[in-house]
């Protein structure tokens, strides 16, 4: 599950004892979901929210419920409500990045991931997802290149070279995030392999060798 659950949400207010109501209601709703009684689960959350409409934890409990029953549009709507009430919580922006990315809204997803990093630059999953999002653009470029690779027409060769530049630019865009991810999580094999392949493609042999060494050390 790529989403961060509401239990990971931390309310930054101090000097107040947090109500246990959101967690209790969430557990009741979960029991209903496990029994296949989704309508009762939704009703339980909505009843609690009617009493405390501004409680961010209740909003997140409702969002968790909708992701469990597969309603991603409602999840996104609730996460946006949560962001409006707590605009400095990085996890909320991260979740919005995930859901928008899954729905093909890559530009919007990227904006949410960047906002999440602005608020919390230490969360490795945000970097990983952002790199993956940027590299989504590689597929269409490679597909076009493959159609031109055997052509000897000057115009096609020129198009191929332009596409190759676009591909390199894509790699250059994601490298800072990938390098930061490796700095935060140096044992992330997926990140190391991706960096290794990118360095090889852009002819950065020194860093290619460095990634190779790191991978060999981890695999041994």
Q: What feature does the model see in each segment?
A:
Residues 2-22, 136-177:
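Short coil/linker segments at helix-helix boundaries
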Residues 48, 81-82, 115-116, 181, ...:
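Canonical positions in the second alpha-helix
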């Amino acid at each position: 599950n790529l989403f961060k659950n509401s239990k990971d949400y931390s309310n930054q207010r101090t000097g107040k004892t947090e109500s246990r109501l959101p967690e209790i209601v969430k557990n009741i709703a979960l029991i209903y979901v496990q029994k296949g009684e989704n309508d009762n689960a939704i009703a339980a959350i909505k009843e609690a929210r009617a009493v405390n409409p501004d409680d961010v934890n209740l909003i997140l409990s409702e969002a968790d419920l909708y992701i469990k029953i597969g309603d991603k549009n409602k999840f996104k709507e609730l996460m946006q409500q949560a962001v409006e009430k707590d605009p400095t919580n990085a996890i909320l922006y991260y979740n919005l990045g995930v859901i928008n990315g899954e729905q093909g809204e890559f530009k919007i997803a990227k904006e949410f991931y960047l906002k999440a990093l602005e608020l919390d630059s230490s969360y490795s999953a945000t970097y990983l997802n952002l790199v993956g999002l940027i590299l989504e653009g590689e597929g269409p470029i490679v597909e076009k290149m493959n159609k031109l690779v055997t052509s000897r027409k000057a115009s096609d060769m020129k198009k191929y070279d332009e596409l190759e530049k676009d591909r390199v630019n894509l790699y250059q865009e994601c490298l800072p995030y990938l390098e930061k991810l490796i700095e935060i999580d140096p044992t992330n094999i997926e990140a190391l392999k991706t960096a290794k392949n990118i360095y090889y493609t852009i002819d950065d042999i020194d860093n290619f060798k460095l990634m190779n060494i790191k991978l060999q050390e981890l695999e041994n």
